[in-house]
Amino acid sequence: MKALKERILRDGKCFEGGILKVDNFINHQMDPILMKSIAVEFVRRFASTNINKVMTIEASGIAPAIMVGYLLELPVVFAKKKKPVTMENMLTTSVYSFTKDRSYDVCVSKDFLSKGDRVLFIDDFLANGNAAKGIIDLVEKAGAELSGMGFIIEKAFQHGGDYLRNAGIRVESLAIIESLDNCEIKIR
């Protein structure tokens, strides 16, 4: 996606350890026009896919997932990183965050993810694939089906995409970062 790649090159910032900061247009302050274009592209790429639910994990995946859900006229469910006291009937799994260097127990209500659901997972980043693996676990525990996974940015050098594709999962990434060596952003 050309507009996204140009924006990453113009406004993205690189930090040691393979961190790409895009908080000025994707995951802290958001550019709603760009986010709409991102959602339109995901909808185009998954147009022939049988989906009845869009899913993400809080917090940075919520905006693109809502835009995709809006365009597809489908409900959006996000896995929570903290169990609400009001949630009784839930599925849980553990997810390691590369950026925050810690693990979270994430949960989703069985009322919103269940057998027969055909899920499209949308998130901001794909690095090592840990969040994606957690979502796969939740989907499997629910008896639902994972129809595909869409990521705004994939960091190819961290191989999460390789893992998912080798597992037979359909992965669509709108911008693929080949390298952040010497803090130079190289996009495929």
Curated annotation (Swiss-Prot):
Domain of life: Bacteria
Cellular compartments annotated: Cytoplasm
Known pathway: Purine metabolism; XMP biosynthesis via salvage pathway; XMP from xanthine: step 1/1
Top-level class of the enzyme under EC nomenclature: transferase
GO cellular component: cytoplasm
Catalytic function, reaction form: XMP + diphosphate = xanthine + 5-phospho-alpha-D-ribose 1-diphosphate
Gene Ontology BP terms: purine ribonucleoside salvage; xanthine metabolic process; XMP salvage
Keyword annotations: Cytoplasm, Glycosyltransferase, Purine salvage, Transferase
Residues binding xanthine: 20, 27, 155
Annotated Gene3D superfamilies: 3.40.50.2020
Broad class of where this protein is predominantly found: cytoplasm
Assigned EC number: 2.4.2.22
Binding annotation for 5-phospho-alpha-D-ribose 1-diphosphate: 127-131
Record-linked Pfam families: Pribosyltran
GO molecular-function terms, A-Z: xanthine phosphoribosyltransferase activity
Family: Belongs to the purine/pyrimidine phosphoribosyltransferase family. Xpt subfamily.
Role summary: Converts the preformed base xanthine, a product of nucleic acid breakdown, to xanthosine 5'-monophosphate (XMP), so it can be reused for RNA or DNA synthesis.
Oligomer status and interactors: Homodimer.
Protein name: Xanthine phosphoribosyltransferase
